[in-house]
């Protein structure tokens, strides 16, 4: 088990967002979090790398309570790709080098090319991110997350802002990350068909509560 949530909850003065969510993510596995808009999917995901703080419960990363891990180190180990690509001004290569540079590490030219080739963008290192299409920018987001050598990836509706062709390309990348690199992930999606294509297990959220969880086929059939 790479990541385990234990009775995770979050509430704000006007609303309970997540209630007693418990689940685990295993090596090489994609876990889908599925539910209607407003069910707490993204709120739950944001708790997994402490973008938001839980009001109850905790998360264990490789057996360690994540409150014992420095936030910057936690976000290196738990990578995230959001619905829309948030890239820094500059070149593609500069974006990939940002995270490692914050830790005093240098991302070599060959590693930049390897990461870009892995997301179908070989030779894009010198391109200005302002000139990328939406699909290309999202693929750079994946390469940037992978540049930090994460232990798990959090994916928050990573294809919902893309056209059909770009969506297929990103789904292929997600499958290859799991199959070839063994990096597990948590995928938030409202698209049940996408969950079936990409995930091995799923949990269904309703009003912040996990109402079903298990193997993807069983959960989606219920």
Stretches found by the model and what they are:
Residues 128-132, 136:
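Conserved ABC ATPase signature
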Residues 153-156:
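Catalytic Walker B motif of ABC-type/P-loop ATPase nucleotide-binding domains
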